[in-house]
């Protein structure tokens, strides 16, 4: 009886590539995944969340202690203590990796960041030139200095997130609402560049997840202002009425580019499934909220890179945006039910068509 030849991984990938079942970019991604050394075990997500909450509470008590001790009386004391706390936290984190000292360093950096912002506010109030742009500049300066030297992933995630939040608040406070689309464009480009890096450094991982979360959150806020729920946001929700179509146009183009980038280039336009994906994306961009496009983009990247965190985020945001989309439809309840049922049928039909096409291709 003849023995079958056993293929190694490289030969198997070459065979699949010859049969047209995988693309060169997928081969590179698989190879880099196999060659990547095993990472050190990290704390579970809930442990890191609890650690961040504990450090935040500790930072508040440190600031409260300074206030009670009357050490923040002068106009520059906040900046001075902020710099000292930031430097102390960075030195402690680089000197020792024990749990207690890591927690202490995180609390010091949190409190130093807050104190630096408070000191900047107090200093600029003396010159009567304070506005939210002062906080943005001060926080950007702190993040630019602390991020490379302070390796705590919790701070590296929260600091950029806070920066985008401050920029959004500035847009609302200054009533330059059209800039929200420029912010979304910058977030989309930045998130795309970060998520599509071939071999991202470990130090960039928190920044990548921060970008992946802030883009849909910005669009979610913009969506909320378009419906009755937005009235509960106060004067910002009542004044903010920016149309969604510019962001939809940007995100549609970005999502189509993502398809071709992951599939191996423009040559894939000849494939039936790519034509179907592009047409479906254009229709979604025309008829739905831009948040659905972002959720689909996260879902595609999550599946492509086997990132369960991004996949989970995509499902979460997709649910939120679909609920908002159907809630905002200006039709009666019966028609909404028909639209939801029809959407489900279309999705099931699309899945069946793609599965049938893939089955035929494998058989060939």
Which positions does each model-derived feature cover?
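Alpha-helical multi-pass membrane segments and their bilayer interfacial helix-loop junctions
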Residues: 2-364
């Amino acid at each position: 009886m003849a023995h079958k030849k056993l293929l190694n991984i490289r030969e198997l990938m070459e065979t699949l590539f010859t049969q047209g079942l995988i693309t060169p970019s997928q081969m590179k991604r698989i190879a880099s995944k196999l060659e990547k050394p095993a990472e050190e075990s990290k704390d579970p997500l809930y442990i890191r969340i609890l650690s961040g909450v504990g450090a935040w509470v500790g930072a508040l008590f440190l600031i409260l202690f300074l206030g009670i001790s009357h050490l923040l009386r002068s106009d520059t004391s906040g900046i001075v203590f902020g710099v000292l706390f930031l430097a102390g936290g960075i030195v402690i984190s680089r000197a020792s990796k024990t749990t207690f000292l890591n927690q202490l360093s995180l609390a010091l950096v949190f409190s130093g960041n807050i104190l630096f912002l408070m000191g900047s506010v107090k200093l600029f109030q003396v010159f009567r030139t304070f506005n939210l742009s002062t906080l943005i500049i001060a926080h950007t300066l702190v993040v630019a200095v602390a991020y490379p030297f302070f390796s705590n992933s919790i701070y590296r995630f929260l600091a950029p997130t806070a920066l985008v939040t401050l920029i959004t608040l500035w847009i609302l406070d200054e009533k330059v609402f059209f800039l929200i689309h420029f912010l979304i464009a910058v977030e989309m480009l930045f998130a795309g560049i970060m998520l599509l890096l071939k071999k991202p450094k470990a130090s960039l991982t928190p920044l990548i997840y921060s970008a992946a979360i802030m883009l849909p959150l910005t669009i979610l806020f913009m969506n909320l202002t378009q419906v009755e729920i937005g009235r509960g946001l106060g004067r910002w929700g009542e004044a903010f009425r920016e149309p969604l179509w510019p962001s939809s146009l940007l995100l549609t183009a970005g999502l189509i580019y993502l398809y071709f980038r992951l599939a191996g280039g423009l040559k894939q336009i000849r494939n039936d499934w790519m034509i179907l994906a592009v047409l479906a994306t254009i229709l979604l961009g025309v008829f739905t909220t831009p948040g659905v496009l972002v959720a689909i983009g996260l879902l595609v990247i999550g599946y492509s890179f086997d990132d369960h965190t991004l996949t989970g985020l995509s499902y979460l945001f997709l649910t939120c945006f679909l609920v908002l989309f159907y809630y905002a439809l200006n039709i009666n309840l019966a028609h909404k039910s028909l639209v939801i049922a029809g959407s489900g049928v279309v999705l099931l039909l699309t899945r069946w068509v793609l599965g049938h096409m893939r089955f035929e291709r494998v058989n060939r």
